[in-house]
């Protein structure tokens, strides 16, 4: 076995980083045999199997490595597992792991969970969390030492395994508790989490068995794995996961939009499709959550229904004068029908409207998102171009709701929320303070933002709870905080409050970066199926959450805030990424404008219909065409038009 280059690499890391990260690339081990669902034995040396590391210093703190295995034996070497291990030394309980899209600081909101619903990792003896390469949106794993301030990350070039025993077998990446530290591990197939070996996070509520993920090396076969080791020191100005995220952007450069439709075409088709959802009758008026062919005619505000979005977006986009009439009617209906449902105790209101006149529901996510659209519509109606709109009823509705929300939040006995769902209330409160001249709205917005900043800004903390169907860390929870911080940042800039500008700029950047780690920065490859049929490019799409492991187009909703942060931070990468996210997520849209929610880039089946989930990677579930998959495109296009920006 050739260990010379491995020894040189350890020295190269020290020279390249100039940092104090206590870690090392361990000598390679080869797994032989398979027993009880895992590698039977690890060996340091297999006669005839040469292992060599080729290294390149990329920049301070970053070394590129290509590990090369060559089998010189005369017969196949069977039931083999190849590996890479980078060990970060320290108390395992103080080493906080961050794997984008699946294990955010070990997913502390589900601490102690033992089933397969949400992966967890705290650093206890025997713990591991290892996942398929194709599952990872940003393909890296980082460990941050909460005591010393060091961090280490391993970035990978995701790849399938030649000679894998399982169909569509890929390499895997994860973390494993060790004596005196935690290992970042790359394996040629084996996966597992929550102390369960050889299982895949393949369903919303449970795991799926994934056994016998070994490989066979043929005589003369050469196999290589490319990875980058990044070491440094985290500070409150740049946590380790943020520095790793920035390197991931630089490595994969997810900015190419040449293959995608232009924004004008996208917005027009989405507008045309939105009109097919229009319903107008004695008890209901607006845009339905589901397609009319389903027979379900509910108008639902916020979250998956987005019933208030077109009231803002259609007049701004101004495709036809009839769009203004529909926008007026849709928001007037909300003002008339739902104003009486506003609860004086907390400002929440009913969000589901049925054709028979009944209304129900109401939660911070849906109410906050709806109020933000209504407030943007009120703002636009006050401009010269929006003079054709009468915002009287909208103003009455929004001011009453925001007054009740701010009253509740500003109470001394206000109950601090368990999740970031109430983060979606911040942006409309900020606009309310400006449009209605209500300082109490701004005070409530700052109180909410201050609470979220105190709870979630720091090592080992991850935003969660912005989604209504997952109880874990999720990108929607991070977006809830990011949207609110960014609104407060703009207000601080407008009012020339330098201290608050600095505070909210950092909070917004942190929440944005955590949200962006759910974003695909590389284009995966797929088995035969719908995604391969369309040469689907995954860059710009986003993983939902550690619990819901499919891609969706939700990132489109975040595009305006990302672009504005790119402008504020003078970071052209963010602007280009925002453009990619908008345009890439139009892929798979039918000629009618319909788009389904679930993109199966990895082993995951959200309906859990008991089919073979490992045969579904590369598939596309197009039946769930709820209105947000249309509304977010229109909302983002409208905001960008108001900003005078072409994506």
PLM region spans:
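Bacterial N-terminal signal peptides that target proteins for export
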Residues: 1-8
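Short, well-ordered helical secondary-structure segments
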Residues: 2, 86, 123, 130, ...
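Bacterial N-terminal signal peptides
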Residues: 8-17
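Boundary at the C-terminal end of the N-terminal hydrophobic targeting segment
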Residues: 20-23
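Carbohydrate-recognition beta-sandwich/jelly-roll modules
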Residues: 25-370, 374-395, 399-403
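Glycan-recognition and catalytic cores of secretory/periplasmic carbohydrate-active enzymes
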Residues: 235-647
């Amino acid at each position: 076995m050739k260990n010379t280059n491995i020894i040189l690499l350890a020295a190269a890391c020290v020279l390249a980083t100039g940092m104090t990260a206590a870690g090392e690339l361990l000598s390679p081990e080869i797994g032989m045999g398979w027993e009880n669902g895992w590698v039977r034995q690890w060996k340091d040396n297999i006669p005839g199997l040469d292992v060599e590391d080729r290294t390149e210093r990329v920049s301070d703190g970053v070394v590129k490595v290509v590990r090369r295995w060559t089998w010189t034996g005369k017969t196949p070497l069977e039931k083999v597992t190849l590996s890479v291990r980078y060990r970060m030394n320290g108390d395992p309980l103080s080493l906080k792991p961050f794997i984008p899209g699946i294990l955010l600081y070990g997913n502390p909101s589900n601490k102690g969970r033992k089933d397969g619903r949400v992966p967890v990792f705290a650093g206890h003896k025997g713990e591991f969390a290892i996942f398929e390469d194709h599952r990872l949106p940003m393909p890296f794993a980082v460990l941050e030492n909460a005591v010393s301030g060091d961090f280490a990350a391993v970035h990978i070039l995701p790849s399938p395994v030649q000679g894998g025993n399982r169909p569509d077998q890929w390499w895997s990446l994860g973390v494993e508790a060790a004596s005196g530290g935690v290992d970042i591990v790359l394996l040629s197939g084996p996966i597992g989490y929550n102390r369960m070996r050889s299982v895949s996070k393949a369903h919303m509520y449970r795991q799926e068995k994934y056994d016998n993920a070994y490989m066979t090396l043929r005589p003369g076969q050469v196999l290589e794995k490319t990875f980058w080791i990044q070491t440094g020191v985290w500070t409150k100005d740049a946590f380790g996961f943020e520095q790793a995220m920035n390197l991931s952007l630089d490595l994969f450069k997810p900015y190419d939009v040449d293959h995608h439709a232009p924004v004008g075409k996208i917005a027009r088709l989405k507008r045309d499709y939105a009109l097919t959802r229009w319903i107008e009758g004695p008890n209901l008026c607006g845009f339905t959550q589901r397609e009319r062919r389903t027979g379900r005619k509910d108008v639902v505000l916020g979250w998956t229904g987005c019933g208030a979005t077109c009231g803002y977006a259609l007049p701004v986009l101004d495709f036809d004068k009839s769009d203004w009439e529909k926008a007026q009617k849709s928001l007037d209906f909300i003002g008339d029908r739902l104003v009486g449902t506003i609860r004086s105790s907390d400002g929440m209101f009913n969000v589901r409207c049925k054709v028979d006149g009944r209304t129900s529901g109401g939660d911070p996510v849906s109410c906050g998102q709806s109020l933000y659209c209504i407030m943007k519509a009120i703002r636009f109606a006050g401009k010269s171009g929006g003079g054709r709109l009468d915002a009287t009823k909208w103003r009455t509705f929004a001011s009453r709701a925001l007054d009740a929300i701010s009253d509740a939040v500003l109470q001394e006995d206000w109950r601090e929320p368990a999740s970031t769902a109430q983060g979606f209330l911040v942006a409309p409160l900020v606009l309310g303070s400006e449009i209605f001249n209500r300082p109490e709205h701004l005070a409530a917005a700052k109180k909410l933002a201050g609470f979220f900043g105190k709870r979630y800004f720091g090592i080992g903390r991850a935003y969660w709870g912005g989604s209504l169907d997952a109880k874990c860390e999720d990108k929607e929870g991070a977006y809830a905080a990011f949207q609110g911080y960014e609104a407060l940042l703009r207000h601080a800039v407008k009012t020339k409050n330098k201290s608050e500008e600095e505070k909210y700029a950092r909070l917004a950047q942190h929440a944005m970066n955590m949200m962006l780690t759910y974003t695909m920065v590389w284009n995966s490859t797929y088995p035969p199926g719908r995604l391969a049929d369309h040469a689907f490019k995954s860059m710009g799409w986003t993983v939902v959450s550690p619990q819901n492991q499919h891609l969706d187009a939700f990132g489109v909703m975040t595009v305006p805030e990302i672009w504005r942060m790119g402008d504020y931070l003078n970071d052209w990468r963010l602007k280009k990424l925002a453009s990619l996210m908008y345009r890439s997520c139009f892929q798979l849209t039918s000629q009618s404008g319909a788009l389904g929610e679930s993109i199966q880039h990895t082993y995951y089946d959200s309906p859990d219909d008991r089919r073979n989930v490992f045969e579904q990677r590369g598939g596309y579930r197009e039946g769930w065409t709820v209105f947000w998959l249309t509304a977010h495109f229109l909302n983002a296009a409208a905001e960008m038009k108001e900003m005078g920006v072409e994506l």
